[in-house]
Swiss-Prot record:
Organism: Klebsiella pneumoniae subsp. pneumoniae (strain ATCC 700721 / MGH 78578)
Active-site residues per Swiss-Prot or TrEMBL entry: C91 (acyl-thioester intermediate), H343 (proton acceptor), C373 (proton acceptor)
Described purpose of this protein according to its UniProt entry: Catalyzes the final step of fatty acid oxidation in which acetyl-CoA is released and the CoA ester of a fatty acid two carbons shorter is formed.
Localization of this protein: Cytoplasm
Keyword line: Acyltransferase, Cytoplasm, Fatty acid metabolism, Lipid degradation, Lipid metabolism, Transferase
Subunit structure: Heterotetramer of two alpha chains (FadB) and two beta chains (FadA).
Record's catalysed reaction(s): an acyl-CoA + acetyl-CoA = a 3-oxoacyl-CoA + CoA
Family (UniProt): Belongs to the thiolase-like superfamily. Thiolase family.
Transferase listed as a keyword: yes
A cellular component term, taken from the record's GO annotations: cytoplasm
EC number: 2.3.1.16
Pathway stated in the Swiss-Prot or TrEMBL entry: Lipid metabolism; fatty acid beta-oxidation
Name of the featured protein: 3-ketoacyl-CoA thiolase
GO molecular function, one term: acetyl-CoA C-acyltransferase activity
């Protein structure tokens, strides 16, 4: 079986969905920009040598519809002979794209794959056109389709207080802002064209979603967003709405050697699991455990974790049950997470994997794990190993 390596991993800045930098930029353009960038950064790879493109996207309608992977590839002037497929596992879409490509390479059905994902939540809202089958209520609580209420459920089940959530959210913004100021994101962000507040076209090389002024005190003034009577989850402790894309270049280790490209990391293991939709945010726990089992590792072997911050009330129970509460500041989301950067649904799996690989390089870490919860009760995880 072929070893799968990550040769490159990049992303756009995260733009604010409401009147943000990418309000006049389409999702296909964000995607095509990264596809072109990966090729220009790795000139020994001919675009025609790409065997397939896997691109995550959740709301596949309007500008994100009709196979956005193919539309973006055509915009990027990738040869018509290169196929492209749009992948949807809700929040885990672009990590699923990574898994699909990795399996193709492992089995020898592909040698080179370009993967990634995008979501323009400003142009295509998360709830656009969603129409749940009424019969689902026989098997699943209606509230299980409301992500904020599933976070409230986890908070109650695991004793996660409002103060704990506010502290974690403030940490996310503080860490993301510190990473921005120190240049820690520079290696992963590709400057991307957008418009400033006055409508002037400019190049953005920073995440505009981060709120550096965020403190526990300011967060404590916010009202519950989903359960106004007894709730503890607020907009401030939920992932921000943002627009963005992320992309990675995968290939077999032997193909990388042929092309003279230096692998940055190896895919060590992958896992996807299901869980009760009412606690969908708990999915990273069984997914991470399964990925670690497949890799022959334990949580203590992992040097760095990237766990998608759908909600503070969701990620804290996962950290607790993975036995990592005492290691948050040493191992988990060291540059902040989706509470500060946002969670463009189809982008996030590739985004956290990209951030993880860059973080592993900075810390000279051997193993890293990226994981995320998925709406309606799933979890997905990937273990990476530095090459």
């Amino acid at each position: 079986m072929e070893q799968v390596v990550i040769v490159d991993a990049i992303r756009t800045p995260m733009g604010r969905s409401k009147g943000g930098a990418f309000r006049h930029v389409r999702a296909e353009d964000l995607s095509a920009h990264l596809m072109r960038s990966l090729l220009s950064r790795n000139p020994s790879l001919e675009a025609s040598a790409i065997d397939d493109i896997y691109w995550g996207c959740v709301q596949q309608t309007l500008e994100q519809g009709f196979n956005i992977a193919r539309n973006a590839a055509l915009l990027a002037e990738i040869p018509h002979s290169v196929p492209a497929n749009t992948v949807n596992r809700l929040c885990g879409s672009s990590m699923q794209a990574l898994h699909d490509a990795a399996r193709m390479i492992m089995t020898g059905d592909a040698g080179v794959c370009l993967i990634g994902g995008v979501e323009h939540m400003g142009h295509v809202p998360m709830s656009h056109g969603v129409d749940f089958h009424p019969g689902l209520s026989r098997n699943v609580a209606k509230a299980a389709g409301m992500m904020g209420l599933t976070a409230e459920m986890l908070a109650r089940l695991h004793g996660i207080s409002r103060e704990m959530q506010d502290q974690f959210a403030a940490r996310s913004h503080a860490r993301a802002w510190a990473a921005t100021q120190s240049g820690a994101f520079k290696a992963e962000i590709i400057p991307t064209g957008g418009h400033d507040a006055d409508g002037v076209l400019k190049s953005f090389n920073y995440d505009e979603v981060i709120r550096p002024e965020t403190t526990v005190e300011t967060l404590s003034t916010l009202k519950p967003a989903f359960d106004p009577v007894t709730g503890t989850v607020t907009a401030g402790t939920s992932s921000a709405l943002s627009d963005g894309a992320a992309a990675m270049l995968l290939m077999s280790e032997s193909r990388a050697r042929e092309l003279g490209l230096k692998p940055r990391a190896r895919v060590r293991s992958m896992a996807v699991v299901g869980c009760d939709p009412s606690i969908m945010g708990y999915g990273p726990v069984p997914a991470s455990k399964l990925a670690l089992k497949k890799a022959g590792l334990s949580t203590s072997d992992i040097d760095v974790f990237e766990m998608n911050e759908a909600f503070a009330a969701q990620i804290l129970p996962c950290i607790k049950d993975l036995g990592l509460m005492e290691q948050i500041d040493e191992k988990i989301n060291l540059n902040g997470g989706a509470i500060a950067l946002g969670h463009p649904l189809g982008c996030s799996g590739a985004r956290i994997s990209t951030t993880l690989i860059n973080q592993m390089e900075r810390k000279d870490a051997q193993f890293g794990l990226a994981t995320m919860c998925i709406g309606l009760g799933q979890g997905i995880a990937t273990v990476f190993e530095r090459v």
